[in-house]
Amino acid sequence: HKTNAYVISNGVNDSFVPPSQPPHNDKFTIVCSGRYSREKAQQQLLKAVAISKHKDEIRVILAGDGPRGSYLKALANRFDIDATFAFFSRDQMVKTLQNADLYVNTAIIEIEAIACMEAICCGAVPVICNSPRSATRFFAIGDNSLYEQYDIEDLASKIDYWFEHPEEKAERSKEYGATRRSFSQRECMEKMEAM
């Protein structure tokens, strides 16, 4: 007996919207959000920033909490990275993503990628881990939005690329913008109701 199968996202809350003005930060601000855990693999970002050509001009915000917090903080200190570790409310997360110059998704295991969808909805250009066990990689547009899993040099080169190409980053944000509507909770609920 055959049936029609549909994959419909849970969607992103409608408060995640692009800022009225692009961010103007004193440092290039990279946001990475998610539980501090092995499968989120945020150490990849810290190690990549440590070898970036622009390390001293970069600020990292690791939004989340979890069992690997102490390890990640120690790593940031060891590499002398300007890093903030915090758990944000929804309103704070929206503001943080709206002010991001880049969003990095380091997860090696991820099913739906709501955090990356939230970043895209806030206008951020993502750089995503190309893990075979993560659905997030399918959001990538273009070569400079994916890096190979655990390849720190590859991630650092993608960070440096976007740091050095702000005009292209603005254009890429517009390309991602075309996908935002499909992530809306309202849109996803309408699809479910239409089934």
Model regions: which residues?
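A charged, aromatic-enriched C-terminal amphipathic alpha-helix characteristic of glycosyltransferases
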Residues: 166-195
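Aromatic "clamp/platform" in nucleotide-sugar-dependent glycosyltransferases that forms part
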Residues: 108
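Carbohydrate-associated surface elements
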Residues: 11
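Conserved acidic donor-binding segment of nucleotide-sugar-dependent glycosyltransferases
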Residues: 141-152, 161-166
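Short hydrophobic beta-strand element within catalytic cores of glycosyltransferases
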Residues: 125-130
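Conserved donor-binding/catalytic core segment of Leloir-type glycosyltransferases
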Residues: 23-40, 46-49, 61
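Short alpha-helical donor nucleotide-sugar binding micro-motif in glycosyltransferases
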Residues: 87, 95-100
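Nucleotide-activated donor-binding/catalytic signature segment of Leloir-type glycosyltransferases, i.e.
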Residues: 70-88
